[in-house]
Swiss-Prot record:
Keywords, sorted A to Z: Acyltransferase, Cytoplasm, Iron, Metal-binding, Transferase, tRNA processing
Cofactor note: Binds 1 Fe(2+) ion per subunit.
Cofactor(s) the record lists: Fe(2+)
Main subcellular location: cytoplasm
GO annotation, biological process: tRNA threonylcarbamoyladenosine modification
Gene name, Swiss-Prot/TrEMBL: tsaD
E.C. no: 2.3.1.234
GO molecular-function terms, A-Z: iron ion binding; N(6)-L-threonylcarbamoyladenine synthase activity
Name of this chain's protein: tRNA N6-adenosine threonylcarbamoyltransferase
Superkingdom classification of source: Bacteria
Family per record: Belongs to the KAE1 / TsaD family.
């Protein structure tokens, strides 16, 4: 079975085709980084308009590669969570295309797709496992008991880790999205030149808070000399603090659940220091294994949507005129 995946939850437009026998066949993506750099971030209305244009371009690109009318058996699209305008663009395209091709359409959960995205590389990851979802809008610790049964063990009370990365990078004068740029700058920083606080690490729960850390970084930047070395030192201190917080909480979750498998997913999972330190932590303390996806599948993409569609293909509905989206949608309640 071949599934066409459509991703438009935020500012990345993605289209992919996944074959249940051959794996991923096509994965195309268009990002809005140039536009976001102009405005210093994502403007929801502009993001929606860009999706409309990009979707046509990407679909035409796929049409040239494959005869999609004979090639696709089902369509899966991101129905939430995400920006309402962006979600509606993808959902409308998916439902319209499904209606015209007379094939089933399936709305899927964006964060479940992220959580299972490492399976694009590892094929199967045995349940149960702890999932660390770290992106621009989410920082969650998930207890994945089995496929489709997820428990939120820890949540972010304010700014997500990815958002804190981007906002701190902006204060340092780095281009958007700032997470990768901040990490590059941090690699040039002097270890322990600055020490940033680690909020909530001593709390018994598994929740996160990054707003205080972001404020501390802003105050440090304001007082700094603004030299490149000083900026690098701040970037390093900030990155070290975020990673420590994430791993301290994740370690507690693994210990609490008595599990040995950790999946790290979402845009921040591309951070190389996070990957390295998580492997050391899990191996040393639990003799366990860490799974994460290839870098191309860390940020928003349609490959993970198409793959999740393949796992949930029995739930697909015949094309209807009803367009379903759910901007606020928790992973522990997957029912529409």
């Amino acid at each position: 079975m071949r599934i066409l995946g459509i991703e438009t939850s935020c500012d990345d437009t993605g289209i992919a085709i996944y074959d249940t026998n051959k794996g991923l066949l096509i994965n195309e993506i268009y990002n809005q980084r140039k536009l976001n750099n102009i405005y210093g971030g994502i403007i929801p209305e502009l993001a929606s308009r860009e999706h409309m244009e990009a979707m046509i371009v990407l679909l035409n690109k796929i049409f040239k590669k494959k005869n999609i009318y004979k090639y696709v058996d089902m369509i899966a699209y991101t129905a939430g969570p995400g920006l309402i305008g962006s979600l509606l663009v993808g959902a409308t395209f998916a439902c319209s295309l499904g209606l015209s091709l007379n094939i089933p359409v399936l709305p899927v959960h964006h964060m479940e797709a992220h959580l299972l995205s490492p399976m694009l590389d590892y094929k199967t990851i045995q349940f149960p496992f702890i999932g660390l979802l770290v992106s621009g809008k989410h920082t969650q610790i998930i207890g994945a008991h089995k496929f489709g049964e997820y428990e939120i063990l820890g949540n972010c009370l304010d700014d997500a880790a990815g958002e804190a990365f981007d906002k701190t990078a902006k204060l340092l004068g780095l281009k958007y999205p700032g997470g990768l740029e901040l990490s590059k700058l941090a690699s040039k920083g002097i270890k322990d030149y600055f020490y940033f606080p680690r909020p909530m690490i001593h709390h018994s729960d598994l929740n996160f808070s990054f707003s205080g850390l972001k404020t501390f970084a802003a105050q440090t930047i304001k007082k700094s000399s603004k030299s490149m070395q000083e900026k690098a030192n701040i970037a390093k201190a900030f990155e070290d603090a975020v990673i420590d917080i994430l791993l301290i909480k994740t370690k507690k979750a693994l210990k609490k659940q008595k599990w040995k498998r950790l999946v790290i997913a979402g845009g921040v999972s591309a951070n190389q220091k996070l990957r390295k330190k998580s492997e050391i932590m899990v191996k040393k303390n639990f003799n366990g294994t860490v799974f994460y996806s290839s870098l191309e599948f860390c940020t928003d993409n349609a490959a993970m949507i198409a793959y999740l569609g393949s796992l949930r293909q029995k739930e697909a509905r015949n094309s209807q005129l009803e367009i379903l989206v759910k901007p606020k949608w928790s992973i522990d309640d997957l029912c529409f």
